[in-house]
């Protein structure tokens, strides 16, 4: 077994800290999604709680990225994690003391506060990877990083469902706070052993943001990758918003948690594979096949009202995701100078994750007010669709997932015609040889 470098050991410590923290937030997100849907009976509200926990952090990510290039990145990670407890405390206060008229607003406010502080973590963590590792370690580390979002959907939704069945949502939120308190000393250990890599600059924050945007936009290959990120995030946001309404229609809360966990094991399998086997060539082909696999799996996931098939295709969907993310992450990382990666990752996070915002804000309402009334009509077209995908509650959400999957397949088939990504691939191969 090859000996791990000192930088990779530090990366693993930060990775463990991030994994623990993300697992706790995954429990809270799952529990709050169930709580909001059961409270209101609307997919729109499920999307709204996800949006509240996502949008503030997204909007602040460019500023957080610029800060990551100016200040101690590990300190910013500690501040982001630690201060996010304020938002969780706000949610706990709302659940305990607010009446039904104010409860939803209090929960949304708490989710937004937690999201705002958490925005400090992501760009600092991504930029720290480049501080710690050599270029030939990037894809292996990227495979490990893919496991972090997977942890949100592995055993922890099942655990959250179990806690909800024997206790209350308060217990889930307290467990989330506990995971944050565990991660802080781990990050501090790494910070203590590292010298700050930030450099003082005379440029102001506005100039930093402009420079970050120019770095991304002027390179057409990078810009195309960011646009692909928008598409992928929209499809994932669609799944996250509509999975609960769709699965609750033919399974209970326990099945929703079980199916979510099985699906996320696909991401775990993909991430573990990439952590062992580095991608060194054929990046465009890997990206195309990954997007194609995701699209086909999304279509099949929404098509069937069969618990076994839903779990199988959910697994396949998330199995493909780490390969797409790793290719995009690596090509971006190898192209942008390390000194500018904080601001660049902050802006890339803002732009590429616009797809999540669009999905969280629109797909629930689109299903509730457009697709559902359409399927309830007696027209020939709606009846044909129902004959294909089945009838019953939750099929409107399933149809929206199928539509998103079809769009992803079309994009994957068009991708090989884009030479800009192949140019990034050629540069990355030259870098590895060097």
Predicted regions mapped to residue ranges:
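Juxtamembrane intracellular "pre-TM" segments in multi-pass secondary transporters
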Residues: 1-11, 192-227
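Primarily residues marking transmembrane-helix entry/exit sites
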Residues: 7-15, 43, 100, 104-108, ...
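Membrane-helix interface/capping residues of multi-pass secondary transporters
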Residues: 11, 43, 73, 104, ...
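Substrate-agnostic recognition of the 12-TM MFS/MFS-like secondary transporter fold
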Residues: 12-29, 50-68, 72-85, 106-165, ...
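Small-residue hotspots at the loop-to-helix junctions and early N-terminal turns
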Residues: 28-31, 35, 40-47, 143, ...
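MFS-fold secondary transporters
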Residues: 37, 90-98, 114, 186-187, ...
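C-terminal transmembrane bundle of multi-pass solute transporters/carriers
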Residues: 59, 63, 76, 90, ...
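Helix-loop junctions on the cytosolic side of multi-pass membrane transporters
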Residues: 127, 131, 173-203, 278-280, ...
């Amino acid at each position: 077994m090859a000996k791990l470098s000192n930088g990779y050991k530090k990366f693993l410590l930060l990775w463990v800290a991030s994994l623990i923290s993300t697992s706790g937030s995954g429990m809270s997100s799952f529990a709050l999604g169930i709580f909001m849907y059961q409270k209101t009976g609307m997919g729109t509200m499920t999307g709204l709680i996800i949006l509240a926990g996502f949008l503030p952090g997204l909007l602040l990510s460019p500023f957080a990225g610029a800060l990551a290039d100016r200040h101690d990145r590990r300190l910013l990670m500690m501040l982001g994690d630690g201060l996010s407890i304020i938002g969780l405390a706000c949610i706990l206060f709302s659940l305990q003391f607010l009446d039904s008229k104010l409860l939803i607003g209090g929960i949304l406010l708490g989710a937004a506060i937690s999201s705002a502080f958490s925005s400090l973590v992501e760009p600092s963590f991504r930029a720290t990877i480049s501080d710690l590792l050599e270029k030939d370690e990037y894809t292996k580390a990227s495979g490990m990083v893919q496991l972090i979002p997977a942890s949100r959907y592995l055993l922890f939704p099942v655990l959250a469902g179990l806690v909800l069945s024997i206790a209350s949502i308060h217990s889930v939120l307290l467990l989330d706070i506990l995971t944050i308190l565990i991660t802080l000393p781990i990050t501090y250990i790494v910070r203590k052993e590292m010298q700050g890599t930030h450099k003082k600059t005379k440029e102001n924050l506005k100039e930093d943001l402009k420079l970050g945007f120019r770095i991304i936009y002027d390179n057409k290959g990078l810009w195309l990758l960011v646009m692909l990120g928008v598409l992928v995030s929209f499809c994932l946001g669609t799944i996250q918003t509509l999975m609960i309404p769709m699965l609750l229609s033919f399974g209970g809360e326990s099945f929703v948690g079980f199916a979510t966990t099985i699906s996320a094991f696909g991401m775990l399998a993909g991430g573990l594979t990439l952590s062992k086997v580095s991608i060194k060539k054929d990046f465009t082909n890997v990206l195309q096949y990954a997007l194609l696999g995701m699209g086909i799996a999304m279509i099949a996931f929404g098509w069937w009202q069969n618990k076994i098939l839903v779990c199988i295709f959910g697994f396949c969907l998330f199995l493909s995701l780490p390969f797409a993310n790793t290719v995009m992450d690596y090509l971006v990382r190898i192209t942008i100078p390390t000194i500018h990666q904080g601001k660049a990752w902050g802006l890339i996070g803002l732009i590429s994750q616009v797809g999540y915002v669009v999905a969280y804000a629109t797909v629930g309402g689109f299903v509730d007010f457009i697709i559902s009334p359409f399927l309830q009509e007696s027209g020939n077209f709606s009846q044909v669709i129902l004959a294909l995908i089945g009838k019953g509650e939750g099929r409107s959400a399933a149809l929206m997932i199928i539509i998103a999957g079809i769009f992803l397949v079309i994009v994957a088939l068009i991708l090989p015609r884009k030479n800009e990504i192949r140019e990034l691939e050629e540069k990355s191969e030259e870098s590895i040889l060097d």
